[in-house]
Amino acid sequence: QVKAVRSYTLPWLRGAGPLTSGNNVEVQLRGEFSPVSINTVVRTILTPLAFLNIDAAVSLGTGWTAAGLNGLALNTMADPFEPIPLEGLVLGTSFGLTGQFDFGVLVPGDWTHVAVVYRAGLDYRLNTAAGEAVPWQWLADAGENFNGWTWNQTALLAYQTPALKLVDAFGVLLETNQNITQFHESPMNEGGWGSDFMEVFLGPIVVLKWGGSHSLNIQFQFATERDYTDESVGNEHFFYRRMDTANPTYWYFRRAAFSYTFVCSQ
């Protein structure tokens, strides 16, 4: 996937003290392109205090099918992963609150920059081609999306070191995602398919920077997954699967991710 971002930052309610001197409003315009989808995002980030961000975003996208991959599909029990190329729009909105702190503020120096970042957010997504409680697939994922709300969290513990020339920071990244709208539909403790399951993603991350305009994020990610019974794990549609209530989840290695960013000069 390729992303193009244009950002505009304006001063906002700035004060004379260290907590408010950098207050601003940032507006991001982002285009996202893949072989099976196109998506546009407008995001606004308010910084009312040095350690606090408030963000909101809206998005609009659609998808098609190419090389056996579905950008957009319905995932019904009667017809799993039915492609619906360009037949629907995926509309989204999100709200989040981020707290961040650098311990280098308390103990100034080149070796004391330990950063802690935590964000809690709510996301809403709507596939205009999907009915109520009908699961759908987006960007060739597992096809377990629903029209409605999800709750997500991100936590980062990172260290900035002056000892390594290319390494800007390294640390541990934790992310979670949980369905709210379908939470009680088929819960884990009742042996359902796990509508209340919280995805957890955890792994080390390294940020490389060079030349003033180039950066590369490297991440190795582990994740939790639902553990189904032996009798149901092979069923094609997840509605027909049943949780193993004795051992409902397990960890697995999910991916190695590389994200390159180039910042154009003004």
Give, region by region, the residue ranges found by the protein language model.
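Transmembrane beta-strand segments that form the barrel wall of outer-membrane beta-barrel proteins
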Residues: 1, 22-35, 39-42, 54-58, ...
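Residues that define the transmembrane beta-barrel architecture of outer-membrane proteins
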Residues: 1-6, 23, 36-40, 50, ...
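Residues on the lipid-exposed face of transmembrane beta-strands in outer-membrane beta-barrel proteins
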Residues: 2-10, 42-48, 95-105, 120-122, ...
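Transmembrane beta-strands of outer-membrane beta-barrel pores
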Residues: 6-12, 31-35, 48, 58-64, ...
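Repeated loop/turn-to-beta-strand initiation elements of outer-membrane beta-barrel proteins
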Residues: 12-18, 50-54, 105-115, 162-171, ...
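Extracellular loop and loop/strand-boundary signature of outer-membrane beta-barrel proteins
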Residues: 28-30, 80-86, 134-145, 182-194, ...
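Outer-membrane beta-barrel translocator domains and adjoining extracellular loop/strand segments
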Residues: 39-42, 57, 66-73, 127-137, ...
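Outer-membrane beta-barrel "beta-signal"
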Residues: 95-96, 237-266
